[in-house]
Amino acid sequence: MTHDGFSASEIWHAPQRLRTVRIWLFLMAALVFTMVVVGGATRLTGSGLSITEWNPIMGALPPLTDAAWAEAFEKYKAIPQYRLVNEGMALADFKFIFWWEWSHRQLGRAIGLVFGMGFLWNVVSGALRGRLAIYVLGLGLLGGAQGTIGWIMVASGLKEGVTAVAPIKLMLHLTMAATIYTLLIMVATRMGKPRGEIAPQSVKRAASLVLFLTLLQIALGALVAGSKAGLVWNTWPFLDGHLVPPAEMLFSVSPLIENFVDNTVLVQFNHRMSAYLLLAVALWHGWQVGRLMPHTSANRRASINVWLIVVQAVIGIITLLYAVPLWLGLLHQASAFIVLGMAAAHRAALVRG
């Protein structure tokens, strides 16, 4: 990564204000991570449809009076989720789910504010300019698009006869968050101090594959969450007694393409298989880096990533066996983003040297 023509080494030796850009980008990544965890809690507590309107500005204020709470509750009562799932819910219970969704949206507003203020400050101070400024601005625009995607996802759960958001739109929402998080970490990492380590192209390609498979695994995990596939087939290593379920189970839904979204057998099977593939590729990459780049920070990063993936796999298996209790579901989602962050930082550091 260059800063309007500066090399990574020159960035490190540039004035202190330039290094504040790196700290700010890592702060943005931490906020996105927090947003993902709060979003996971919002989903797991069934709170995502409690606010039935999208009002980016005025929606920042929660109900402040009994009358305002009653009005918000009546709006929730008008959607199918209340009538088909939560009929008879008390106002206190509604407030519980409302606060989760409101907090999720409020955190999104805070992220936008921190990004906007930080971007303006760094541009005015001269720390951000040229291609780097344009690139970072693009990340901000992705964040704005993410807010719109979030509302499209919520709106998919407000339709008649529907009690939850569409799995494919949940996948899009989480994958966009993962993409923004990845790019923030990669840009910030590449602005760090070079270590003088030269990575072969084969190592860089393998690290890219690990990063891609991690993103894919998160996307497939979102489909598991959206289709509630984690609440069924709660056994491991077998799925309903099969290592590989028969075709009549994997493709029981018509048309064929819908099996990849709505068939809980295939959705969970895909998530399992991609996890095995990710672990295998990470192990191979760890061996590769150990052979080609021994006694380097790259070797340490690749090894750490393997162990993080192993821990995440164990958490995933336990989460499945216990049918996704709240705390385990949150831990599994948070751990996935820790793995992703490590994979992104590792890949970016290989470019930095």
Set out the residue ranges of the language-model regions.
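Polytopic transmembrane helical bundles with strong interfacial aromatic enrichment
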Residues: 2-353
